[in-house]
Amino acid sequence: MNGIMLVGSAIIIFFLAYRLYGRWLLKTWGFDPNAKTPAYKYEDGQDFTPASKFTVFSHQFTSITGAGPVTGPIIAAMYGWLPAFLWIIFGGIFFGAVQDFTALYASIKNQGKSMGMLIEQYIGKTGRRLFLLFCWLFSLLVIAAFGDIVANTFNGFASDGTLVTPNAAAASISMLFIFVAIAFGIFTKKVKPSEKLRFIIGIILLILMLAIGIAYPIYLDRMSWLYIVFAYIFIAAVMPMWILKQPRDYLSAFLLLAMILGGVIGVLAVNPTINMPAFVGFSVGGKDLFPILFITIACGAVSGFHSLVSSGTSSKTLSNEKDSLFVGYGSMLVESVLGVVSLVIVCSAATGGHLPEGTPFQIFSTAVAGFFSMFGLPHDIANCIMTMCVSALALTTLDAVARIGRMSFQELFTVDNPEEMSTVQKICTNKYFSTIITLVFGYLLCLGGYMNIWPLFGAANQLLSALVLISLAVFLKTTGRKGFMLYIPMTVMFCVTLTALVESIYGIFVKLSAGQFVFAVDGLQLILAIALMVLAISVAVHCGKELIGVKDASKAELNN
C-alpha cells in the first residue's frame, strides 16, 4: 500500500459523499434560500453578524480543526493503518459530517439557538440545564488542554535553556495575527470589499505577518505564554465576532488549507510507502481497539465539540440556508482529509512496523516541512511555518471554546423573563463575569498539563457527540423530518464513550488500590468523569423518552 492510494481514494470518496449523501440530506430536510437567516433577523453586532459563505466556512473549519485530526490518527496508527483509515472515512461521512451539518441546520431553523436552547425547546428545561452543565464542564477540559498545548508550542526555550526559534517565531506571528485581524475586521466591516479584493488583501497580510514574525521572534517561557494566551481568549470571548474572531479565522484558514494542500501534494509527489501493517491486533500495549480507537480519533471522524461551534457561533453568522451544507458538512470532510494525510505521514515514517519517536505534532510538522522543502522552501522557514500552522490549529479552537463556554454558563442562568432574574442570575449572565469564571477554572485545570487531561477530554468529547445526536434526532422527529440516519451513530457513540469512561474510572480506582493515587490529578479526573457520566445518562434518558414518546411534527412546523 502507498500514500497516493490512501489519500487519493479518501478525497474521491469524500467528494462523492458531499455531492451525493450531503445533498440528499439537505434536499430531504428542506431549505429555503430566500428565507432570512438568524444572522439577519437578530443582527446585534455582537454574536449575530451576517458573513459571506467562505467567511463562515473559515470560522467553522478553523474552529473545529484543532489538534485532533493530527494527533488522533497518528496515535491510533498503533493498531495498523486500516482500522484508523476506515474509521476516518465512515466516521467522517456518516457520523461527524452529519452531526455538524444537522446541528447547524437545526440552529438556523430555530432562531440561531445553541444546542442547550434547542434541547429546552424540544425536550424540556431539565434536559437543557443538564446539557448546558455538561457543555460547560467539557469547555473547561478543552480550555485546559489546548491552553497548555499552545503555551508549550510558543515556549521559546528548551529544557536546557537553549533558544527554540521556530516556536518563538510562531508565537510572534500569532501575536501579529491578533492585531492585524482586528484591523482587517474593521476594514471589512466599514469598506465592505469584494470577495476577490478581500482574498488578495488577506494573502498579502498573511505573507507580511509570516515575514515579520520569522524576522522578529518573541522568546518567552511557557508560563508567560500561558498568561498571555488566557488574556487573549478572554478578549476573544467577549469581543464582537466581526472584530476579531471572524477575521482571524478567515486569515487562519489560508494557513490551514495551505498546510493540508502541502501535505496532499507532498504525498502525491513522494508517494511514500506505508510501512505499518494494515492490522496489528485488537489490543496493543494493553489498550483495546474498542473503545480506544474511536476515542482517540475524534476530530478526524466525529467530535461533539463541533456541534457547539455549528449551533453556538456559525449559525449566527450564516447568510443563506443553502450554505449550511458547505459550511457544516463540507468543513468536516476537509478535516477528515487532514486526518488521512496525518495517518499516511506517520505510517510512511514507521520502521520495521514501529511508529517513529516524538510527539504527534513533531512527527507531522517535520514530515510536511520536508515536503515544502522539496519545492525550494528552506527547511528552517518551512519548519517555522508548520509550527505556526499547528499552533493555529489549537489557538482557533481555544478562542472558539472560550466563547462557547461563556455562552453555556450564561444560558445556565437565563430565564424566559429577564425582569424576573435575581441579582445572582444577573451577575452570572453578565458576559464578563461568565467569561472570567470559565477561564479561572480552565486555568486551574491547565496547571496539571494537557497529558493528564487528554484521556478524559477524549471520552467527554465523544460522549457529547452521542448526546447531540440523540437530541438532533428528537428535533428531526418532532418537526416531521426523517431522522433514521442518526440512530446508528448515536447508539455507537453511546456504547463507545460509556465504555471508555467506565474504563477510565476503573483505572483510577486501580491506582488508588496500588497507592499511586494523586488527588490533584487523579482525584479531579475521577470527580469529572463521574459527573460527566451521570449528566450524560440523565440527558440521554430525557432525550430517549422524548424520542420514543413524541409524535411526528407535534411540536413545531416542518419549515419553522
Task: Write out the residue ranges for each language-model feature.
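Extracellular loop-to-transmembrane helix junctions
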Residues: 2-19, 76-106, 116, 171-181, ...
